[in-house]
């Protein structure tokens, strides 16, 4: 299994890094037989239940772009599309066993997700699949997996630079279509919503330094780390 050829300069030296095209990090990885068996031959059988249910209250996947990708059947997009369709089927599926975490569909989706993280972690399909799996885990109370999956999705969004288009290093060049740009942005919004929910137990109103040092040492430490006074600190969300 070939690993993703990620541009190392993105992390090592942002000044010399140049944004790459969206196809630069694509892969020709084949769809596993077990995934094909779970999806079947009719993609519409997966899409229709999703867009008539989940998409009505959590819209972040473009139906038009998805249909275009299915019809194009591009070799570099097939693996990512299969992952996304599998995760769409997962969130619309009602497990028939008592333990949702042990369902075949969930275990296969998690396994394929881990595989695609190695071969094509920066694709939009992978990003969206993480959001769907996190949504499923939150909805079925699968913890701490839900917490960890949301963290993975958040880090992918940060790597792509969606959180700050002006100041953050942009991994990819500006997309050719407005539709892609909007879909990517909505996926980040979906991630942010899940992040606020999954991280709720870790919210604290203040960040305290527990130590026996004298106060002048604490003042110096606060200045060194650029921490504002306690009275000015807002609620912090920790990943």
What positions do the PLM features span?
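Intrinsically disordered, low-complexity activation-like regions
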Residues: 1-54, 157, 211, 239
């Amino acid at each position: 299994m070939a690993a993703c050829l990620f541009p190392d300069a993105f992390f090592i030296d942002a000044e010399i890094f140049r944004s790459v095209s969206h196809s630069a990090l694509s892969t020709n990885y084949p769809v596993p037989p077990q995934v094909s068996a779970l999806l079947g031959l009719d993609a519409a059988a997966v899409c229709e239940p999703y867009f008539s249910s989940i998409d009505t209250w959590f819209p972040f996947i473009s139906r038009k772009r998805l249909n275009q990708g299915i019809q194009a059947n591009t070799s570099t997009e097939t693996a990512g599309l299969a992952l996304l369709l599998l995760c769409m089927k997962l969130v619309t599926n009602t497990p028939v066993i008592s333990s949702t975490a042990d369902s075949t569909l969930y275990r296969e989706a998690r396994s394929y997700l881990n595989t695609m993280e190695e071969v094509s972690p920066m694709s939009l399909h992978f990003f969206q699949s993480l959001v769907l799996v996190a949504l499923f885990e939150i909805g079925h109370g699968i913890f701490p997996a839900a917490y960890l999956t949301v963290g993975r999705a958040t880090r992918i969004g940060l790597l792509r630079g969606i959180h700050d288009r002006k100041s953050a290093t942009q991994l990819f060049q500006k997309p050719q279509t407005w539709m892609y740009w909007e879909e990517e942005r909505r996926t980040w919004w979906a991630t942010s919503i899940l992040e606020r929910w999954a991280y709720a137990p870790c919210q604290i109103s203040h960040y305290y330094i527990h130590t026996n040092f004298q106060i002048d040492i604490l003042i110096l430490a606060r200045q060194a780390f650029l921490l504002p006074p306690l009275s000015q600190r807002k609620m912090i969300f920790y990943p």
